[in-house]
From Swiss-Prot:
Keywords: DNA-directed RNA polymerase, Nucleotidyltransferase, Transcription, Transferase. The gene is rpoZ. It comes from the Bacteria. It comes from Anaplasma marginale (strain St. Maries). SUPFAM superfamilies: RPB6/omega subunit-like (SSF63562). This is DNA-directed RNA polymerase subunit omega. The keyword Flavoprotein does not apply. It is an enzyme of class 2 (transferase). One of its GO terms (biological process) is DNA-templated transcription. InterPro entries: DNA-dir_RNA_pol_omega, Pol_omega/Rpo6/RPB6, RPB6/omega-like_sf. The keyword Magnesium does not apply. GO terms for cellular component: DNA-directed RNA polymerase complex.
Length: 128
């Protein structure tokens, strides 16, 4: 920030992280088609959001609540996706006794296919 710019954000009590959250949420809204409260002047959404915040053109409590709700929704989707993936992998994996191998190597599954090209031939570029 330039020297004279620090006065613009004095209403945030030095909490620049809250400012970033607010500007991010507002920029997201602008990207989704929300109307601007200030003239755009060819600026990108993030700059417009910061100008709206500095100009006190927004209900910051409402913007912050929207940001929190967006984060909650993302976390719920992320958690649900991980739970679904874990459930799928546990259903696909065969149950085995402790200490017992779950799968067999490629050579044990199909010896004829493993003889096609062994490891040394593969790494040397041979095989013919």
């Amino acid at each position: 920030m330039r020297e004279g710019d620090s006065g613009y954000f004095s209403c945030y009590d030095g909490n620049r992280f809250r400012l970033v959250i607010l500007a991010s949420q507002r920029a997201h809204e602008l990207s989704s088609g929300a109307c601007t409260a200030v003239a755009r002047k060819g600026d990108k959404n993030t700059v417009v959001a910061l100008r709206e915040i500095v100009g006190e053109q927004l209900d910051l409590a409402a913007v912050f609540r929207l940001a929190v709700n967006r984060c909650r929704k993302y976390l719920e989707e992320f958690t649900n996706a991980r739970e679904v993936a874990a459930a799928r992998s546990s259903q696909a994996a065969p149950k085995s006794a402790p200490g017992q191998e779950i799968g067999k190597s490629f050579r044990e599954k199909d010896p004829s296919a493993a003889a096609f090209l062994d490891q040394e031939q593969f790494f040397s570029g041979g095989g013919e």
